[in-house]
Amino acid sequence: IGCDGLLFSPYIVGERTPYTDSQIRGSFIGIDTHHQLKDFTRSVLEGITLSLKDSQRIMEEVAEEKIERLVSVGGGAKNKSWLQMQANIFNTPIVTLKTEQGPGLGAAMLAAVGCQWFLDLQECADQFVAYKEEVQPQPQQVDAYKKVYDRYQKMYDATKDLCHLYFSQIEK
């Protein structure tokens, strides 16, 4: 957890949520001589997931309720280690689907509700969505990741000015 002090900010081409900043760029913080390729790899997965936690936090604040379950689809849903990492960082159960066509299924469900074949999305989901597995948060890991997330949230402010200075110099 936290890759022994190594943190990655995943702003490779700027960021939109929660920062509207096209000039921010990704960075590794805390690189040391003992870090290996596996640490950088895990740090990238953690950084991406911590960035998604920013979105989860905003959605929960706006909705004024906790998200009870998140659905993971696509290639990342096949990585059991990443699913567990997500459950621990989000402190929310992560479920995968029996079908790998999550986006297509969602579009078809929206169309079916739009055509009034179902009263609402919940009724449609009850008919079409089949879950494969559920990964539960691990309390000790959740607590450890809260500390990592606190450090992660400071990275944007700590690197923003340097990234903006860099962009102002290369644009000339």
What are these regions (language model features)?
Residues 1-172:
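Glycine/Thr-rich phosphate-binding loops that ligate phosphate moieties of nucleotide
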